[in-house]
Amino acid sequence: MAAMAPGGSGSGGGVNPFLSDSDEDDDEVAATEERRAVLRLGAGSGLDPGSAGSLSPQDPVALGSSARPGLPGEASAAAVALGGTGETPARLSIDAIAAQLLRDQYLLTALELHTELLESGRELPRLRDYFSNPGNFERQSGTPPGMGAPGVPGAAGVGGAGGREPSTASGGGQLNRAGSISTLDSLDFARYSDDGNRETDEKVAVLEFELRKAKETIQALRANLTKAAEHEVPLQERKNYKSSPEIQEPIKPLEKRALNFLVNEFLLKNNYKLTSITFSDENDDQDFELWDDVGLNIPKPPDLLQLYRDFGNHQVTGKDLVDVASGVEEDELEALTPIISNLPPTLETPQPAENSMLVQKLEDKISLLNSEKWSLMEQIRRLKSEMDFLKNEHFAIPAVCDSVQPPLDQLPHKDSEDSGQHPDVNSSDKGKNTDIHLSISDEADSTIPKENSPNSFPRREREGMPPSSLSSKKTVHFDKPNRKLSPAFHQALLSFCRMSADSRLGYEVSRIADSEKSVMLMLGRCLPHIVPNVLLAKREELIPLILCTACLHPEPKERDQLLHILFNLIKRPDDEQRQMILTGCVAFARHVGPTRVEAELLPQCWEQINHKYPERRLLVAESCGALAPYLPKEIRSSLVLSMLQQMLMEDKADLVREAVIKSLGIIMGYIDDPDKYHQGFELLLSALGDPSERVVSATHQVFLPAYAAWTTELGNLQSHLILTLLNKIEKLLREGEHGLDEHKLHMYLSALQSLIPSLFALVLQNAPFSSKAKLHGEVPQIEVTRFPRPMSPLQDVSTIIGSREQLAVLLQLYDYQLEQEGTTGWESLLWVVNQLLPQLIEIVGKINVTSTACVHEFSRFFWRLCRTFGKIFTNTKVKPQFQEILRLSEENIDSSAGNGVLTKATVPIYATGVLTCYIQEEDRKLLVGFLEDVMTLLSLSHAPLDSLKASFVELGANPAYHELLLTVLWYGVVHTSALVRCTAARMFELTLRGMSEALVDKRVAPALVTLSSDPEFSVRIATIPAFGTIMETVIQRELLERVKMQLASFLEDPQYQDQHSLHTEIIKTFGRVGPNAEPRFRDEFVIPHLHKLALVNNLQIVDSKRLDIATHLFEAYSALSCCFISEDLMVNHFLPGLRCLRTDMEHLSPEHEVILSSMIKECEQKVENKTVQEPQGSMSIAASLVSEDTKTKFLNKMGQLTTSGAMLANVFQRKK
């Protein structure tokens, strides 16, 4: 042992707790385990330095015994291995130790070593092979080595009394087959029936060994459990402790269970049985019949009555409460001294010692009051000078200074510096956010945190402190930005700093100590958690220690090194670890002030800005936002802003740029330098154009609302920010005549949409009634659906205004002003009505109505705008401007011009963005009437139907509007004009997708059947695409049969034989819906009828009509060629139809004929392969070559086609 100890301790002391590489950690753990095994071999086997079997430099025989014949080779080897006198001890391998144990038959010690190695994951082959071989445990003759003659003391060797070797139990017996867990269960004791006593003794020895190990395990678990129960405090109770300063210490789980047990015992003893039963039910997780259920290794205390009687025998010192608004004059203090010496008899107690103790307490209180008076006078003097300075500089005096909540166990009573409440017990205006002229003593108390004042220590202790300890405890002041953000908005903005104190460690980090005494207390709390975990990647446990030391250390170089360790503590910190580090950095910043934050923390961030690991760069980005409130204002708007700008432009990790955006948002909540406005705008545009969706989302949630708040304060929201975005949209539309950049349009428009809440808040705050908005009486409730759901708390209008109550009052006055008094003198609202809305409507008219994405974006924008500004504003300000432009009247129909405004995107955006904002009956009627008028006017003027189609597509995406759309279409079905009926028939196709089958069956099918028998052929033909869509989307058998019969009548009725347009529409519909329709419908109806149409087209005389039909047949066959077609169908219909089509193309379009020949050849090859009856999935080499050659020719010919791409759009369409 003496030889081993230095090695063990030296290696243990060489572990670097700040080492971040996991491989090095594994090596250290492995080395530690190996040394532990060696030490356990000596210590666990009952050796001591004075025993005959101990391993000492004086005993050259390392692992032998005094009774064993000496082996020179072994003895010298062991002596060299374990070290001799004056020599450096050499490292002994575990395999050599195992070999020696097995050689000397110390089998239980070898078994224990084997078990330890298995638990550490390093199995030794020698021990594994030995204990897995049952033959090693058969009966043997003779005396085992290391076993002297009976009665010789001290002959146990390594397997002495501590090891409890079974071989010593019988004085000379042999060890039976009980060497390992794997062979113990299969031990056959019946084989040794010749000596029952020896067998019993050996069995007892083995069981005793296992029992001893089990007892040690149980004892260790009990100790750990008791320790955890004594120290851990639930999070909720810690929160209650923080909010209830009168509670001296939070209750622990162990204490709670013990008190529950005593209370229940008291109730039972005093016959409160029903109360006891109820109490037990409410604490069903505890067994009240067994004290051991409360806590292991804990003695049961006396009952409640005994505790109460015993409490009466103790003196309880009252709390020392000091009215900080009062003081003690020196002459009064001097007069108190003789009074103390002449105390009245009522204060005397029978014990002189207690009398002297009371005198000593009073003297200490006098000293305390003197010191408090001295400190307050010093504070008054300093505050007077600061007030004079601030008055000269025309600055407002901050009523409250940021401070950290002090540790609760360090104060006699809790103050409320953080919340701004005055601790004076005589004050009655606590918590009111009003302007109060503080007295000098009040200002001193509200500015200096209680734990920072020198009166926390008696005068005798202060006099013994070094000067630095007192001078270092100065009030920490932070630069307050000259901003007007509401507290709710400010709090919501800071919520994006990802810090955490909702854990034991987070609680320790957030309340780092600032005095010598509290450092020691904190070390006592944290060290028990650090020691067992620091080698198991729990290095965040070190954060409180590092921060406390960095906060209080007098040497700048050492502080810099500690902060460097903090930022490099974890190689790749995860989300929780980063939050813990950020929490510590903020606590550090609150204590040390802005100067040290700039000088000590920011350089650490700068060093990591280009680190190779994104987790480190993420920590830098998050820390910039978290530290923003604690930095000098000049640094916020210069260095930190530049750091974040660099990371936004250069960093390739999406997560890092997302954190940069959130930190930029926090910076925008504190920056007050107007010169940085345009730099912020450029950063905003860069963030909006970021390729990562995460970054763009963070921009809308944090950066944009914070920047808008600053813009509002500068007066630039309407005059610059919104106008600039509108101008960029207009420029995009002017330049995008040949191809609009829809991504940029979405970028700018979504930014405008995110600015709507800020714009509405500005309108409310600058309204004529804003000065009347006072909270008094009952506050009206805001409807839950009054505003659209915000993307983040910063886009909530109530957050921007300050509170939901204040917003409710403003909304009530807002609606009244719009209804009764108008907008005269209301500049911010007049700007919206007279400038913003006309410009937006003009932009809407320039959008391509066929761009579904653009129509949808502008529709959502107007919907949010109208919902935010309210129903009265929408009805009186928005709708009239649209109606003035659209002018829906049948008298104004211009058949030549097509009533141009109705063909633009203004129609769908007005219908879906404005008229759908509110869903009352009158609103729905207005929407139905508008769509009916548009459908009528477009039909009668022979104008394009794109605007109406866009409206139906946008509304049809929401099932809530399906009934409304069918109402509009039924109006068209029964209209007197065939043009309107034809338009209604075509609109059915757009409404069917996503519609329920029940609605299709009850409302759509009857309307289509009515139109299919219309006197006008054009109306009948217009129903064919809708019938095809039903075949594609519906699975109801009866409905499909009705549609099939209607289509069959179109194809087989003689009156339609010469209807070229009808045949063209049917072929186009078959090509569109065939691949997606039901297979039976496709095989039995579509393909056979296409074959018939191809045959009839061969007889067509007019070449133009023949080519038209052939072209549509080619597209239909190309789409159907990708579907599975049975052999019979291929032979009887598909191939004959292709051959008929090839006949047409030979004369009319030779380039199509080549492709058709390749398709026919490939289909024939498929049929031939099936007739050969080859195994499924296999194909001959020749067939494979032919197929590849066919594909190549087909693709080459496709590339040489001169026809439009639209004709071949469905060539490679697969069946869905």
Curated annotation (Swiss-Prot):
Acetylation recorded as keyword: yes
Modified positions (Phosphothreonine) in chain numbering: T32, T183
HEAT repeat boundaries on the chain: 601-639, 640-679, 1004-1042
Compositional bias annotation for Gly residues: 148-163
UniProt keyword annotation of Coiled coil present: yes
Organism domain of life: Eukaryota
Region described as Disordered: spans on this chain: 1-73, 135-177, 401-477
Any one of the GO BP annotations: intracellular cholesterol transport
Coiled-coil ranges from the UniProt annotation: 197-231, 359-397
Subcellular location: Recycling endosome; Golgi apparatus, trans-Golgi network
Chief place where the protein resides: other
Residues recorded with modification Phosphoserine: S20, S22, S54, S56, S180, S182, S186, S385, S453, S792, S1149
Domain LisH span(s) in chain numbering: 255-287
Function: Regulates intracellular cholesterol distribution from recycling endosomes to the trans-Golgi network through interactions with RAB11 and OSBP. Functions in membrane tethering and promotes OSBP-mediated cholesterol transfer between RAB11-bound recycling endosomes and OSBP-bound Golgi-like membranes.
Protein name per the record: RAB11-binding protein RELCH
Organism of derivation: Homo sapiens
